[in-house]
Amino acid sequence: MKTNHREIKSYLVIINSPKGSVENDNEEFISLTLSAGTIISGITYVNIKQFNRNTLIGKGKLQSIKKDIESTDIDLIIFNKDLIASQERNLEKFFKHPVIDRTRLILDIFAKRAQTNSGKLQVELAQLKHLSTRLV
């Protein structure tokens, strides 16, 4: 994840739901982000019982994150949960920064590391399938 030979500064939003092994999942997500070549400029942990269908997280936490990122130099916000297209759009509009989810992060890592033509094509196909769900 490099643009113009400059590492991307990311802000992580780690959502902990009642299900799952929180600590291992969080460590894995942070490792994935670092593997993508980003610099982690900030992290927010969100404990959630019920997901908001418009933004995944509630208004109070959104405001808290927005305040946090306004005082931080970031290029990208990465969520550890999968986002549906409308959530991604709503979050980008609210934060005024690009937002990606865990799936997009993993696809970007694969794209960066693919070496054979076949591998590159397979990754590109997976990326296009993922992006096709974001078309309106």
Where are the predicted features?
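Extended, highly charged alpha-helical segments
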Residues: 105-136
